[in-house]
Structure formats: structure tokens, C-alpha cells
């Protein structure tokens, strides 16, 4: 199994969110391929599911995930190489907003819980696939910190679009 470093510090980092943001620049999308079993494979799998592909969210980039990535690349007119790289991620992530439900929302909620990005396990969004008030609060707080400290182009609107997804998925890796 490949355990490549994707983006940012390794899983298990306990840096506070503000410390992360102080040094944060827009990280490149991670490169994921068959054999990987590192963050953010679960996010990739959730987004594939959100796009209609049947794949388990198990954190392992196995044959089923590889087939789903290749199928998505064909559907999207991308180079079919089975690698989830910048172009695949940019086409794959689903814009979500308050009131939305489903696997893309679950991905976001998992990301906020990953290494306690939410700031407090007690306040972390419940992973239920519903973009409710608690999830929106975390999105807006995260966007505001990003806007103030690292990426002034980030709009604080509670909508998770391409740039917000890239920041959330790549901020810790």
C-alpha cells in the first residue's frame, strides 16, 4: 500500500486552527491513486458517491474507487488515468450550501471532524449528511479565518465551493 504525503502536515497533527491558518497558503489538490489509504481518500469517495458512483467510503483507494475515478474522468472529458489530481478534484467536488443533504455534506462534516478542525469535539458538526445550522456555523467561521489570515478572495457566505473545498481538504492533509 502506498502512503504518500498529500497536502499539509501528516494526519494526527494537533495544531490549533488559527496556527494552521497563520502559515496556510492555498495548497495544491492532493494526488491520490490506487493503493493509497491516506487522507483525503474518504473525501474523494464521498464526492464520487455524490456524483452517482457506487463506492464504499472506507478510506482505501482500491479497485472500486479506481474504477469510479476512471468512470468519472470519462464522464467529465478528462484524461483517464485513474489518478485523482487537480483537474479531477476540480471537476468532482460538489458545491454545497445550507439546507443541502447527502454525501458531499458528509464529506465536509468528516473534514471538520478530522484532526478536530472544528476547534472542539463537543462543537463539531454531527456527521449526518445534513447541512444544518451547526455545519453552517463552522463553514462561516472557517471561511472568515481563511479570509482574514490567508486567502482574502474567500467569500464568507456559508457556501462550500471550489476554493473552500480546496482549503478544507488540503489544509491538513
For every predicted segment, state its role.
Residues 1-173:
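Cell-envelope/ECM-targeting effectors and their regulatory/trafficking segments
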Amino acid at each position: 500500500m502506498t502512503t504518500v504525503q498529500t497536502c499539509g502536515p501528516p494526519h494526527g497533527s494537533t495544531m490549533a486552527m488559527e496556527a494552521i491558518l497563520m502559515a496556510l497558503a492555498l495548497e495544491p489538490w492532493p494526488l491520490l491513486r490506487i493503493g493509497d489509504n491516506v487522507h483525503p481518500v474518504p473525501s474523494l469517495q464521498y464526492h464520487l458517491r455524490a456524483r452517482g458512483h457506487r463506492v464504499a467510503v472506507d478510506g482505501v483507494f482500491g479497485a472500486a474507487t479506481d474504477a469510479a475515478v476512471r468512470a468519472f474522468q470519462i464522464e467529465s472529458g478528462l484524461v483517464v488515468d485513474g489518478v485523482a489530481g487537480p483537474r479531477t478534484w476540480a471537476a468532482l467536488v460538489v458545491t454545497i450550501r445550507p439546507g443541502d443533504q447527502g454525501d458531499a455534506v458528509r464529506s465536509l462534516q468528516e473534514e471538520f471532524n478530522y484532526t478536530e478542525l472544528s476547534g472542539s469535539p463537543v462543537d463539531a458538526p454531527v456527521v449526518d449528511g445534513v447541512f444544518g445550522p451547526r455545519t453552517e456555523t463552522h463553514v462561516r467561521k472557517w471561511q472568515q479565518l481563511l479570509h482574514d489570515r490567508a486567502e482574502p478572495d474567500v467569500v464568507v457566505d456559508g457556501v462550500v465551493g471550489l476554493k473552500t473545498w480546496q482549503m478544507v481538504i488540503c489544509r491538513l492533509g
